[in-house]
Amino acid sequence: LLLLLPILAFFSLFVGSNSSSDTDINTNTPQQQTAKVIWDRVLKEGGTKEGAAALLGNNQAESELQPSIIQSNATYNEAKAMDTTLGGYAFGLAQWDSGRRVNLLNYAKSQKKSWTDTNLQVEFMFEQDGTDSTLLKQLVKGTNVKQTTEDIMRKWERAGAVDSLPKRQGFAEYWYTFMTTGGDSGTGGGSGITPDIPSGWTLDKPINTSGYIASSYEYKQCTWFTWN
C-alpha cells in the first residue's frame, strides 16, 4: 500500500478540478459577488473550475458582469423588449437578444422578480434557456480554460465579434486565478487592491484613470495595469 501512495499522488496531478463549491472566496465588489454566484452554480451543475472561469470570461466580455445592463447602455422600453424579432437590444449577463431576451423577461414575470436579478438570470441560464441550457451544462465541464472559453463563445454565446476571443480568454484566466486563490484579500496582496503608493515611492504626476479600456477592472488591480 505504501508503494502505491507515490503513484496515486502522481496521477492526482492530472485529475480535473473538482466540482465542490468554494465557500471561502472573499468578494468585496458587486462584480465579484456576481462572479461568485455564477462560479458556484457551475460547480453545483457538475462543471469544472476551468469551465466556471470560461463562462465568467464570456459573461464579462458581454456585460461586465452587470445583470442590469442593456446593449449599448440603452434604456428599457417594454415594446422593444418584448419584440422577439428585434435584435441589437440585448439584456443581462449573457446579453440575451431577440427571442432569448423575451424568454428571460417572461421568466422573470412568472417568478414575480425583476429581470435584473442576478440569481434569476443564472437560473434562467442553466434551466430556462431551452436547449441552450442543456448545451451550457455540457460546455462548462471543459478542463482547459482557453479552449472552453472559445467553445462557450462560439457554441453558446454565438458572439458576433469573434475577434474578442483573446479578451474573453484573458478575463477567464483572471477569474480562474481570482477564484482559486481566495478572492479579494483587500490587503494589497494577491487579488486585493491597495489605494496607497508604497512607502518610499513617489509619482512625478497624477495617474489619469479615465478613458482606458479596462473599465471592468477596478483601478490599481494588477489586471488593470496589465490591460492598460
Residues of each region from the PLM?
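Conserved short loop/turn motifs at secondary-structure junctions
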Residues: 23
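Secreted/periplasmic proteins that engage bacterial cell-wall peptidoglycan
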Residues: 30-107, 123-126, 188-228
